[in-house]
Amino acid sequence: EDPYKIWISEIMLQQTQVKTVIPYFETFTSKFPNIESLAKTSLDDVLSLWSGLGYYSRAKNIHKTAIILEKDFNCSLPDTLEDLMTLPGIGFSTAGAILSLGFKKPGVILDGNVKRVLLRMSGNKSPMNQYKTEKSLKEFAKILLPGTKHKQYSQGLMDLGATICKPKNPECMKCPIVTDCCAKEKNIQNEIPVKRNEKEKKEKRIEWVLIKTKTKVLLKRNKNSGICQNLWLLPDKGFLSLDKIKNLDPVEKNFPSFVHHLSHKKLLISLNIYTIKNKDRLSINRNLYNWVNISDSVNMGVPKPVREILNKI
């Protein structure tokens, strides 16, 4: 019932399965039990705990919002839709979850489970993720809001979608609102929701180099914009100029190439591994690169494919 924890869980659950989120949520809220502790920490600390969860803009927005809440809202989440939606990363549905579950006020939640219930109730065969569909669902959900027991209503609707009104083979005869379901009446419950045709993922080739001593590995801070902004990556192949490579010893057995899937891209990743006896012989820009203890590197803010590599070296 803590609005802070509702907020963190709702952000983590965007595009991510519950079973994946649970350990991250527990670790995150243990390290940052309240808004004040989150606002006072560094973005690096936030990203390190988020590492592997993906969609890193969520973590950056959480940190930005915590700082705003400390400065302008006395370290508390506001309890109005208008104020909540001014905060980075908090949209209509997340604000609705905070209001109904955290403050027990009227609030519309439109997560995937709730959308599916509402689409079937209304017999709506529009593609689920279209803007026009979202808009009509928002209005329909507002009409259905009860006058009291807002938390119980929202939680019940989410649970209904998760356990009974499932994506495939919904258990309609167990549903408490089956008599109000337009899709069941027309026997089209298995045809809803309709999803837009997904575009084929674009492929992107990434060639990394891993340079290590016996105890340290070289990482690069990604200053570029995009999903990995401010995270630590491995240097790319272009780092290896002639004057650098002469100080390195290639490792004969290199890491096998592998594929990492993002929501919109397929990353084809190859890796060459080098060792160096004396790291001081390698000229680096210390604003971008840093030698890190191998044992510490997996706990830094690194994206999932980098973490997988570091766990295996």
Residue ranges of predicted features:
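Catalytic cores of DNA base-excision repair glycosylases
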Residues: 1-171, 177-190, 248
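Intrinsically disordered, low-complexity, charged terminal extensions of DNA damage-control enzymes
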Residues: 159-313
